[in-house]
C-alpha cells in the first residue's frame, strides 16, 4: 500500500471551492480506500525564522492543511496524476505503508 500526503493552505481555492474540499470530493469520487483532512495547529516553512502557532492574538495568514489517503500503489499514483492535472500548488509526498 502507498500513502499520499497533500500539504496545502486551508484558504486556497480551486475555482470557487476550498481546495481541500475539492480534493476530498475528488478522492471520494475516485473511490480511494480512505482519506482524512487535518488542519495544522503549529508549523514552519522554508522562509520562517520561528514556529507559527495561532492563538487569541495571532492566526496563521495561510492556515496549513494536510490531506492523507491510502490505497494500492497503482491507484495512488493514478489519482495523484489526475489531481496534478487539476492543480499545481501544494506539496504531495508518498510513502509505502504496511497495514496491520
Predicted features by range, described:
Residues 1-100:
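Positively charged, small/polar-rich N-terminal and surface patches that mediate targeting and assembly
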